[in-house]
Amino acid sequence: MKASGTLREYKVVGRCLPTPKCHTPPLYRMRIFAPNHVVAKSRFWYFVSQLKKMKKSSGEIVYCGQVFEKSPLRVKNFGIWLRYDSRSGTHNMYREYRDLTTAGAVTQCYRDMGARHRARAHSIQIMKVEEIAASKCRRPAVKQFHDSKIKFPLPHRVLRRQHKPRFTTKRPNTFF
């Protein structure tokens, strides 16, 4: 999978094709994060074939639809449990992100894993994504924003204007 652009959350439901032995095969549902519905269906078959004796040729997708965030204007903390294949083996990991949407947090996770661990999107498997309360957060990078009186410093910028002289009679004002 290529994690291009912002990923979307899909709910994919599939099952085996009905046979004379089993008239109503059980349905399997998955939350898949993918750039589009075609990739979401493909990932569903990839994961389901690992878990159950099921293949695309002997199964069908019953439903595939995008899941939209309930409150996309509220900043939330997300905990993401994942496994990924590195050059030395397979690792489990728990990560925390702050974002407006679940899909945004997962996209952030894919970018972060690529930057910090050189993990490509195809080698990352998201196992669970959960919205977590501020009191349950563990990572200091997320906890630092849980202050109600948070302040951000104004940068001390020195503007270099191109067509102004380098030396002048008055001091520059760099406090904005």
UniProtKB/Swiss-Prot annotation:
GO MF term list: RNA binding; structural constituent of ribosome
Location(s) in or outside the cell: Cytoplasm
Name assigned to this protein: Large ribosomal subunit protein eL20
Similarity field: Belongs to the eukaryotic ribosomal protein eL20 family.
Keyword Ribosomal protein found: yes
Transmembrane segments: none
Cross-link (Glycyl lysine isopeptide (Lys-Gly) (interchain with G-Cter in SUMO2)): 11, 128, 170
Chief place of localization: cytoplasm
SUPFAM superfamilies per record: RplX-like
Phosphotyrosine modification, residue list: 63
GO cellular component: cytoplasm; cytosol; cytosolic large ribosomal subunit; cytosolic ribosome; membrane; postsynaptic density
Subunit structure: Component of the large ribosomal subunit. Binds IPO9 with high affinity.
Keywords of the record: Cytoplasm, Isopeptide bond, Phosphoprotein, Ribonucleoprotein, Ribosomal protein, Ubl conjugation
Organism field: Homo sapiens
Keyword Ubl conjugation: yes
Modified residues (N6-succinyllysine): 76
